[in-house]
């Protein structure tokens, strides 16, 4: 009779263990984000180019993603980087004001001498240096989190 009691206890422990394992599996399934592309992109860094990069961005960024601004083309079809819109100059001016308020002061003499021309040249230089998601993931390798940086907010 003693062996039957031990057998029932072992069977009960196995049943409890299976029940706990099933509950943990169900809890993990609820916690794991199913709407993100994180499961579809294996961990680690990847080199993604062309359609593979586009597909990965579509999966990772369901609300779209940022791209680099294209050069504006004039009515004749020629691109002209020197023609910046007034709104872009104002946007850059507000950026400089923010930096100025953060403790970075700029020379009023240079501002008076060059005006928005300095801002335009800085923006053009910044555009040239940053290659965006293509440079990040095709020229170099990138991870899921690096792709997610380019996602638009909801």
From Swiss-Prot:
Keywords: Cleavage on pair of basic residues, Disulfide bond, Secreted, Signal. CDD domains: IlGF_insulin_bombyxin_like. It holds the Pfam family Insulin. Residues 1-29 form the signal peptide. Disulfide bonds join 49-138, 61-151, 137-142. Residues 72-92 are annotated as: Disordered. GO terms for biological process: insulin receptor signaling pathway. Residues 73-122 form a propeptide. InterPro entries: Insulin-like, Insulin-like_sf, Insulin_CS, Insulin_family. GO terms for cellular component: extracellular region; extracellular space. Coiled coil: none annotated. One of its GO terms (molecular function) is insulin receptor binding. It is found in: Secreted. Heterodimer of a B chain and an A chain linked by two disulfide bonds. Possible ligand of InR/insulin-like receptor. Belongs to the insulin family. This is Insulin-like peptide 1. The gene is Ilp1.
């Amino acid at each position: 009779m003693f062996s039957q009691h031990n057998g029932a206890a072992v069977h009960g422990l196995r049943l409890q263990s299976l029940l706990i394992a099933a509950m943990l599996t169900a809890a993990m399934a609820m916690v794991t984000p199913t709407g993100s592309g994180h499961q579809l992109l294996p961990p680690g860094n990847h080199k993604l180019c062309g359609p593979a990069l586009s597909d990965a961005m579509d999966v990772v960024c369901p609300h779209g993603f940022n791209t680099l601004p294209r050069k504006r083309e004039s009515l004749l079809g020629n691109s002209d980087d020197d023609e910046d819109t007034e709104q872009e100059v104002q946007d850059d001016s507000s950026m400089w004001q923010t930096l100025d308020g953060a403790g970075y002061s700029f020379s009023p003499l240079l501002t008076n001498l060059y005006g928005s021309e300095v801002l335009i040249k800085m923006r053009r230089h910044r555009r040239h240096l940053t290659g965006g998601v293509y440079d990040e993931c095709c020229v170099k390798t990138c991870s899921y989190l690096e792709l997610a940086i380019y996602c638009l907010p909801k």
